[in-house]
Design a protein with these regions (language model features):
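Active-site region of glycoside hydrolase catalytic domains
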Residues: 36, 144-289, 296-321, 342-343
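C-terminal motif of bacterial Sec signal peptides marking the signal peptidase cleavage site
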Residues: 18-20
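Hydrophobic beta-strand scaffold residues
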Residues: 115-117, 313, 347
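Active-site mouth of glycoside hydrolases
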Residues: 30-204, 209-217, 229, 356, ...
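Bacterial Sec signal peptide processing site at the extreme N-terminus
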Residues: 22-32
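Aromatic-rich peripheral "rim/lid" segments of glycoside hydrolase catalytic domains that contact
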Residues: 324-384
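Bacterial N-terminal signal peptides that target proteins for export
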Residues: 1-9
Length: 384
């Protein structure tokens, strides 16, 4: 696919083959000190940003952002990155993005923040391709070439980032996998895990479940046994009608009726008044009770998996779209935080700024300070 990646792949596959014949790749038994609790995503900077380059991208996240997050009480950040920002179509590095990533990690170190480097979107896999009727774009799970490209990207990321302490930086080698079969994802996990462990036996690896890191598919997730430097990740935006109310990219974007939380979200009157075109998607919200007990129920498989493997559990994305009624948003957020604290689940909100965030980069001011105050009422690390 990409000339440079293809050359690297030939060398890498040869080395892996020889290694596999003579040694067994094993993670270190030593557990590092990558402890996390309260964080946020630095989204739409090195990922999902097709416009900002040069000075605009450089100025988007600066030192004062890391200082602010530290002073507010956050202890880590998740940094989504995209292949198109770090490599051109021939597989050549694009230096500016690499410099910005290391700048971010250096600032994290300066301001006592741990970091997860999240490979968010790659050319062979985009988590939303199915919803955008571009299913053919996802070749990762059917192409050995694409899988080797993914490993090659992580070889290069590892070369650049391995100098950062295992206690401070973790790798999330893919975001929101969407494989037709759960075993396709499990097999890719094993392959990438083996490749990374041969280079970095103690680095914390964040691994999520198939189908958008959904809580429903955690029970099918298989992670390498005996590796304690792994974090299990899931994402949670339920109920979507509440968290994404009015979001133009969702099936229920045209719903303008009232919503309620906790309880049944949509009344019979509001359902009857809704457009016929959305009633099929809307109907479940007229009977299902949404409350803190529903959140606990949804989390049970993720909690069980973390106990089974004896590893940390992490909700990597959760949040409420900016136009949603703030009182409803705060009620849901409070319930989420309560469950996180009950089961010692680390979290990163989606996100710091942008349309789910609490900070306005253009105005350089809070756009939702009460949300931040609520987030900081939850449990933090005892010794950050």
């Amino acid at each position: 696919m990409k000339k440079l990646f293809r050359s690297l792949a030939i060398v890498a596959m040869t080395v892996l083959t020889l290694t596999a014949c003579t040694t067994k790749s094993e993670p270190s038994n030593e557990v590092n000190n990558f402890r996390i609790k309260r964080g946020t995503n630095l989204s739409h900077w090195l990922s999902q940003n097709n416009e900002d380059r040069g000075e605009a991208r450089r100025l988007h996240i600066q030192e004062d952002d890391f200082a602010r997050l530290d002073s507010l009480g956050f202890d880590f950040v998740r940094i989504p990155i995209d292949e198109v920002q770090f490599w051109d179509e021939e597989g050549n590095k694009l230096p500016e993005a690499w410099d910005l990533l290391t700048f971010a990690l250096d600032q994290c170190g300066k301001y006592h923040l741990r970091a997860i480097v999240d490979l968010h979107i790659i050319r062979s896999h985009y988590f939303n391709a199915v919803n955008e009727n571009d299913k053919a774009a996802n070749t990762l799970f059917t192409s050995e070439e694409a899988q080797q490209d993914l490993i090659d990207m992580w070889y290069q990321l590892s070369d650049a980032l391995k100098g950062y302490s295992n206690d401070s930086v973790a790798y999330e080698f893919m975001n929101e996998p969407v494989a037709e079969d759960h075993e396709q994802w499990n097999q890719l996990i094993a392959k990438v895990h083996k490749a990374l462990r041969e280079r970095e036996p103690q680095r914390t690896l964040v691994i999520g479940s198939n189908l958008w890191q959904g809580y429903q598919t955690i029970k099918y997730l298989k992670i390498p046994e005996g590796d304690k430097n792994i974090v299990i990740s899931f994402h949670y935006y339920n109920p979507m009608l509440l968290t994404h109310y009015g979001a133009w990219w969702t099936p229920l974007a045209s719903y303008s009726g009232k919503i309620n939380y906790p309880g049944v979200l949509v009344s019979k009157e509001d359902f009857d008044a809704a457009p016929d075109s959305i009633k099929k998607e809307l109907e479940p919200y007229t009977t299902q009770e949404w409350n803190i007990d529903k959140i606990r129920e949804d989390f049970k498989d993720a909690i069980a998996a973390a106990k089974q493997y004896n590893v940390q559990l992490f909700c990597g994305e959760w949040g409420v779209y900016e136009p949603v009624d703030r009182e409803l948003a705060y009620k849901w957020t409070k319930d989420m935080l309560t469950v996180f604290d009950e089961f010692d689940i680390a979290w990163t909100t989606w996100c710091y700024d942008a349309d789910f965030g609490f900070w306005d980069q253009k105005k350089h001011d809070f756009k939702d300070k009460p949300l931040v105050d609520l987030l900081m009422e939850s449990k933090g690390l005892e010794n950050k």
